[in-house]
From Swiss-Prot:
InterPro entries: AC_1 (IPR043990), AIDA (IPR030930), Autotransporte_beta (IPR005546), Autotransporte_beta_dom_sf (IPR036709), Autotransporter_pectin_lyase_C (IPR012332), ESPR (IPR024973), Pectin_lyase_fold/virulence (IPR011050). Interaction with TamA of the translocation and assembly module (TAM) initiates insertion in the outer membrane. Gene3D superfamilies: 2.160.20.20, Autotransporter beta-domain. This is Antigen 43. The signal peptide, cleaved at the inner membrane, guides the autotransporter protein to the periplasmic space. The C-terminal beta chain translocator domain inserts in the outer membrane via TamA. This domain probably forms a hydrophilic pore for the translocation of the passenger domain to the bacterial cell surface, with subsequent cleavage. Finally, the mature protein remains tightly associated with the bacterium. It comes from Escherichia coli (strain K12). CDD domains: PL2_Passenger_AT. Changing Q888L: In strain: ML 308-225.
Length: 1039
């Protein structure tokens, strides 16, 4: 093979092939020193399965096309065109250990090379390449010259002595300009992916050497490190230059330049939309800021010899150092003092605490921010200029209209806050004659004096309690009053076609005058009268509560809003159109005579809103608040909640049309269903219901049916006496099995009792009822003896029980429930003629009742005493040896006295109740000998006292049909009020006839123990007599 004359060769043993191979030391060195090349060659031949191809392009030789892959090498001393390189980065980017790819040696040239992922083009000193395109994952290591390289995600590493001209850096490409290198006419289209001033550093251009005439386009970034220099850079919109080293003659055509600590920028020109930012420790000299350009100097930054052209912006604070000239002449910001500064087009000066500013000009788009404790004098505010301050600053100057203003000593006078301006009034300070034209006025307490004006989007934000004793006016456009509390004896004046929104505020003023436009109250509590002009609109939204009158305007109440209309308002409430989904209440703070209030509405659109009206059912005239529909229509649905404003126990029967609560006048109409009654109104014995009349007005009328509590309370007498009679029982319920010894009996009984509907309370009958009862009774004989051929037994008993009865109104609707807890004590005397069996049973009983009557609207309690006397007789006849027939007759007389009381609609009084009952019937049953005899149990402990089986027990059964007649029942119940004529008396009758059937079974289970069970049913066949069913179990022990 023909080689270059200075080529030397070396035999290298290949362990894989087991033979010596020849390696060109110069070729393999690729410009590196020989020892390194030999070591790398040995590594290659011992690590690769076959020796990689080694292609040499000799001087004068030209190779067109071809691809390097799989660790191939091309050493170029001549010329290559159109090569594709896909290998060479075996050890990663910019690594000296890499040996593959294309190596352009001294005198070699490579044109239009394509480097793909994993490919390496190395240009050694004296070598040159042009028009190389490097894709993502590929790289160019440059020590020679490269012209017009394109980095399409690829990388270019410039080592000492390298020169790169016309490099284009596209998406995620990276050019590293190391010390001792020069990159000229670079175009940077990537690098800013991390956002403004992000130090991502691995895309775009990274300069540690020299970068000349760089163009930075949108999304491009040049980072100039401390040892780097960038000269004559142009930065377009969306691109930026980050300077830690030196930047000379940079032009910002919409792009940004960031000068960091230790960095310097000289002779920068900032054109329209360009922005130079000098950070803490950064230095900029001789910057020129043209129209719409911006220079920002942060605290600790320095910019000297600045030329600020008209329309250019300066953004800085008194903690920075800035000197130069502007359209007013020389200006400076040095050591906390600013003088002759012009602020416009986004310019801003922050005057910090303890610092000063003099002769400041604030024009359109400029902002002067004077912090608490800062001072700004001779301020000239132009149209569109923004002032930010609070009452702890000291500011004086002229407004855009030429008027003087000042802030100082806790007093602000004649401030004008344009859009973007902000002033904060601190607690204890005062702001007089403030005008807010689209700006923000924040009051943290303090006092508003003179005329405070809000226009064109102005915002007044309150924090804490602020006082206004003068006038808060809105003249043009929209305005917002939000938060906190505004109190005082001042007024709010709303003019102009815009909207004033009061949000989350407590507003208490002498008046709100709504002259034009719309007033929206949102989630606020407002206590004042709203005096409006026709054609205006008032909206109550959210959870707003308005306490005051409205006259006159169009009103909208949202579902959560409330309007309280006081009876002491300065004007009568008059509304044109009312759209109502909220709550309206008539309220009063007056004592003494009832004075009804009136709300007049032209058109009402009800949206399930409520109106609470005060009503005096105990008064014949002027007895209710009133809604007046004047000449318009009432549509939709409005709920009227009725409040008894007088004695809650008062109530009269209405006469005529009733109590007027909605009045239609001047041809007004109301739809059927436009108003519904939201709650029951009760007074005395009456319910009052809402009715629409033919005159389109609505009235409350006392109902023909009495309120639910009337039958409920009337049933209490009947329920208590029914219970007493059941407890007293009859002889068959008491005496059990006859015997010669005294006995003790324990009985448990439960059942159902009630009364049918026989015309109800209106017809003098006992109200319809149905319920249950239960009791436990313990009784015992005290004496058993024989006197003059008669057996005499005397004893006492006690019982405790409970009954619960549901009562219905005359129309069948539920009236309520009466519950009774009762305790009884009684005595009895039994007389039995020994020879004939004729017997008589005498019972006397007293019961203490504790009763509670509950309806939907009331809970009423009463206590009382019941008494009862009973005489019963019977004569048994034997039909067979074991079958007996016993005719029976019983007379019972009972009484009841309940305490008087009152509920929330009136008093309740009970007269003495009484009733007489006669029962006639017979008892048919077995009459077996109940002698226990000898025990037959097979268990030793029970052998003498128990039977072997149930069939051996002595048992008797019986049935007892009867007719019960109730007569002479009395019992008055009176309800009413202290108002003359309001009381009514009801005397529900219990008279009637019922059929009763009882049946039982008795068994002697021990010599001295008898068990009995019984069940019965009573059915009313006439009148209001009681009916029901019962069950009982009795344990009888003799001794």
């Amino acid at each position: 093979m023909k080689r270059h004359l200075n080529t030397c060769y070396r035999l290298v043993w290949n362990h894989m092939t087991g033979a010596f191979v020849v390696a060109s030391e110069l070729a393999r060195a690729r410009g590196k020193r020989g020892g390194v090349a030999v070591a790398l060659s040995l590594a290659a031949v011992t690590s690769l399965p076959v020796l990689a191809a080694d292609i040499v392009v000799h001087p004068g030789e030209t190779v067109n096309g071809g691809t390097l892959a799989n660790h191939d090498n091309q050493i170029v001393f001549g010329t290559t065109n159109g090569m594709t390189i896909s290998t060479g980065l075996e050890y990663g980017p910019d690594n000296e250990a890499n040996t593959g790819g294309q190596w352009v040696q001294d005198g070699g040239t490579a044109n239009k090379t394509t480097v793909t992922s994993g490919g390496l083009q190395r240009v050694n000193p004296g070598g040159s390449v042009s028009d190389t395109v490097i894709s993502a994952g590929g790289g160019q290591s440059l020590q020679g010259r490269a012209v017009n390289t394109t980095l399409n995600g690829g990388e270019q590493w410039m080592h000492e002595g390298a020169i790169a001209t016309g490099t284009v850096i596209n998406d995620k490409g990276w050019q590293v300009v190391k010390p001792g290198t020069v990159a000229t006419d670079t175009v940077v289209n990537t690098g800013a992916e991390g956002g403004p001033d992000a130090e991502n550093g691995d895309t775009g251009q990274f300069v540690r050497g020299d970068a000349v005439r760089t163009t930075i386009n949108k999304n491009g970034r040049q980072i100039v490190r401390a040892e780097g220099t960038a000269n004559t850079t142009v930065v377009y919109a969306g691109g930026d230059q980050t300077v830690h080293g030196h930047a000379l003659d940079t032009t910002l055509n919409g792009g940004y330049q960031y000068v960091h600590n230790g960095g310097t920028a000289s002779d920068t020109v900032v054109n329209s939309d360009g922005w130079q930012i000098v950070k803490n420790g950064g230095v900029a000299g001789n910057t020129t800021v043209n129209q719409k350009g911006r220079l920002q100097v942060d605290a600790g930054g320095t910019a000297t010899n600045v030329t600020l052209k008209q329309g250019g912006a300066l953004v800085t604070s008194t903690a920075a150092t800035v000197t130069g000239i502007n359209r007013l002449g020389a200006f400076s910001v040095v050591e906390g003092k600013a003088d002759n500064v012009v602020l416009e087009n986004g310019g801003r000066l922050d005057v910090l605490t303890g610092h000063t500013a003099t002769n400041t000009r604030v024009d359109d788009g400029g902002t002067l921010d004077v912090r608490n404790g800062g001072t700004a004098t001779t301020v000239s505010m132009g149209n569109g200029g923004v002032l930010l301050a609070d009452s702890g600053a000291a500011v004086s100057g002229t407004r855009s209209d030429g008027k003087a203003f000042s802030i100082g000593g806790g007093q602000a006078d004649a401030l004008m806050l344009e859009k973007g301006s902000s002033f904060t009034l601190n607690a204890g300070d005062t702001a007089t004659d403030t005008t807010v034209n689209g700006g923000l006025f924040t009051a943290r307490g303090g006092t508003l004096a003179g005329t405070t004006t809000l226009n064109n989007g102005a915002i007044l934000t309150l924090s804490g309690k602020t006082v206004n004793n003068d006038t808060l006016t809105i003249r043009e456009g929209d305005a917002l009053l939000q938060g906190g509390s505004l109190t005082g004896n001042g007024s709010v004046e709303k003019s102009g076609s815009g909207t004033l929104t009061v949000s989350n505020t407590t507003l208490t003023q002498k008046a709100v005058n709504l002259n034009e436009g719309t007033l929206t109250l949102n989630d606020s509590t407002v206590t004042t009268d709203v005096i409006a002009q026709r054609g205006t609109a008032l909206k109550l939204t959210g959870s707003t509560v308005l306490n005051g009158a409205i006259d006159p305007t169009n009103v909208t109440l949202a579902s959560g809003a409330t309007w309280n209309i006081p009876d002491n308002a300065t004007v009568q409430s008059v509304v044109d159109d009312l759209s109502h989904a909220g709550q309206i209440h008539f309220t009063s703070t007056r004592t003494g005579k009832f004075v009804p209030a009136t709300l007049k509405v032209k058109n009402l659109n009800g949206q399930n809103g409520t109106i609470s009206l005060r009503v005096r059912p105990d008064m014949a005239q002027n007895n209710a608040d009133r809604l007046v529909i004047d000449g318009g229509r009432a549509t939709g649905k409005t709920i009227l909640n009725l409040v008894n404003a007088g004695n809650s126990a008062s109530g009269l029967a209405t006469s005529g049309k009733g109590i007027q609560v909605v009045e239609a006048i001047n041809g007004a109409t109301t739809e059927e269903g436009a108003f519904v009654q939201g709650n029951r109104l009760q007074a005395g014995a009456f319910n009052y219901s809402l009715n629409r009349d033919s005159d389109e007005s609505w009235y409350l009328r006392s109902e023909n049916a009495y309120r639910a509590e009337v039958p409920l309370y009337a049933s209490m007498l009947t329920q208590a006496m029914d219970y007493d009679r059941i407890v007293a029982g009859s002889r068959s319920h008491q005496t059990g099995v006859n015997g010669e010894n005294n006995s003790v009996r324990l009985s448990i009984q439960g059942g159902h009792l009630g009364h049918d509907n026989n015309g109800g309370i209106a017809r003098g009958a006992t109200p319809e009822s149905s319920g249950s009862y239960g009791f436990v009774r313990l009784e015992g004989d005290l004496m058993r003896t024989e006197v003059a051929g008669m057996s005499v037994t005397a004893g006492v008993y006690g019982a405790a029980g409970h009954s619960s009865v549901d009562v219905k109104d005359d129309d069948g609707s539920r009236a309520g429930t009466v519950r009774d807890d009762a305790g009884s004590l009684g005595g009895y005397l039994n007389l039995v003629h020994t020879s004939s069996g004729l017997w008589a049973d005498i019972v006397a009983q007293g019961t203490r009742h504790s009763m509670k009557a509950s309806s939907d609207n009331n809970d009423f309690r009463a206590r009382g005493w019941g008494w009862l006397g009973s005489l019963e007789t019977g004569l048994p006849f034997s039909i067979t040896d074991n079958l007996m027939l016993e005719p029976q007759l019983q007379y019972t007389w009972q009484g009841l006295s309940l305490d008087d009381g009152k509920d929330n609609a009136g008093y309740v009084k009970f007269g003495h109740g009484s009733a007489q009952h006669v029962r006639a019937g017979f008892r048919l049953g077995s009459h077996n000998d109940m002698t226990f005899g000898e025990g037959t149990s097979s268990r030793a402990p029970l052998r003498d006292s128990a039977k072997h089986s149930v069939s051996e027990l002595p048992v008797n059964w019986w049935v007892q049909p009867s007719v019960i007649r109730t007569f002479s029942s009395r019992g008055d119940m009176r309800v009413g009020t202290s108002t003359a004529g309001s009381g009514m008396t009801f005397s529900p009758s219990q008279n009637g006839t019922s059929l009763d059937l009882q049946a039982g079974l008795e068994a002697r289970v021990r010599e001295n123990i008898t068990l009995g069970v019984q069940a019965g049913y009573a059915h009313s066949v006439s009148g209001s007599s009681a009916e029901g069913y019962n069950g009982q179990a009795t344990l009888n022990v003799t001794f």
